[in-house]
Amino acid sequence: MSTPRRLPVVATRRFERALDALLDHYDGLRHLHPDAGSRALRLIDLVEGELAPLLAAQPDIGRPAQLSVNQGETEKNWLNRLAPLTARRRLQAREWLLGDFWILYYRSASAVYLASARHEREAEYR
């Protein structure tokens, strides 16, 4: 019996920017609540410790992402740039709820690409 193939998990620059934006947002709330950044720090811990091994072993674990070009101008531009890549690589947009945050990722036959993150109460990805 052979071991299932584990796909490489690649964090895109957009994903890193989304995490930075979440950290900045929660850091800006510290004056309201001293523990404001704990959720974002927990997300970083989960991303670094659990997310990559989980998606490498089970890349289809997330639900199909419901992306809409009506969400916002930045989302629309991003989806328009992504469309040609999706057609060639046969990428599947999926999302996984990790703690309080949705992780947007794309699965291809050869890799998993972490694309963005948002709090579960946010309407669109960063």
Where are the regions a protein language model picked out?
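Enriched for short, Lys/Arg-rich terminal
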Residues: 2-4, 84-126
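Basic, Lys/Arg-enriched alpha-helical interface segments
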Residues: 1-93
